[in-house]
Amino acid sequence: MRLPITNRRAFLRATTALPLVSLAPLGATAFAQGLAGYPARPITWLVPYPAGGFGDALSRMLAQKLSESLKQPVVVENRPGAGGQIGANFVKQQPADGYTILYGDIGPLSMNAGLYPKLSYDTLKDFTPLTRLLVSPTLLIVPANSRLRTWQDVVEAARSTKGLNYGSYGTGSQPHIWMEMFNREIKGNLTHVAYKGGAPAVQDLMAGHIDLMLDVTPSSIPLVREGKVRALAVVGSEQRLPQLPQVPTVGELGLPGLNVPGWTGALVKAGTPEAIANLLHDELVKAVQSPDVVQRYTELGLQVAPSSRAEFGELIRTETSRWGKVIREVGVRLD
């Protein structure tokens, strides 16, 4: 499923009709006034998850790149909890001055709006999107010694009276909602086991305490290569992953509607001066496209995919609508 992406053609058509001679000095003056010496002190990069995950690792790589380009320290701070709400609320409460950047993924930025009736922030009203950073496929994995050898084995076992147990990072997480979509699609009998994060879920999977789970590629690809788990399907990619060419996509397996990717991105508080938001966008795009960043995350099955600010805002809007509908259909609500 491809998401609608905006472009700048209408903007370019409008601006090319204006006198170029007058635009240049006005634009330069406005840009300089908007920056006003920014950045003049350290910047906080807020990660709404615990330290140690791939999002945290990516954040630290990008923070180092930004520190070098902006000539100011960029300090990564972890504020996990409540599905990313604690971190998002912290950024919402900071001044709109560009000194606090929110890193987030599809959970706190889109899915929470459908999960939490009393969510205390609105992503597109309270924050200014900067850029998408990564597109992240996932893998449906089973224990190495599982009797489930193929996708069809999973479908047949899930439809049986006994059914299957699947793990997730927690109630309301993307793997949880996706597995419920899958269960509805195949009319299966799956039982959810919620964990506090991906690591304990994967440990129980390898020990055989659960039958299957959906996991991000940075943690699952190494385990597949080491023979500790087996991957039966790729979710969120149009093509098979070059790291695991033997593993089919869910589109190939007849369920293209379930082929939805995850993604990550960066935002600042709404009201941040345009010049600062544009500067951060440009520097983040350069940082995430650095050869070492691209190599590192491509090896882990992720796609470096920066966007314009408008494109990222439209992505958040579209995903919030889509996941809100899915969450209502599967009946998951959190306090």
Language-model segments: residues:
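N-terminal secretory signal peptides
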Residues: 1-25
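N-terminal (or domain-start) structured segment
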Residues: 31-124, 187-211, 216, 223, ...
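Short beta-strand/turn micro-motifs at beta-sheet edges
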Residues: 33-35, 126-130, 251-257
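An extracytoplasmic/periplasmic, membrane-proximal ligand-sensing/linker region
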Residues: 38-42, 188, 225, 274-335
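Sec-exported extracytoplasmic/periplasmic mature domains
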Residues: 63, 67, 71, 92-96, ...
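Hinge/capping helix and adjacent helix->loop/strand transition within the periplasmic-binding protein
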Residues: 93-99, 114-200, 250, 263-295
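C-terminal lobe and pocket-closing loops
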Residues: 220-289, 318-321
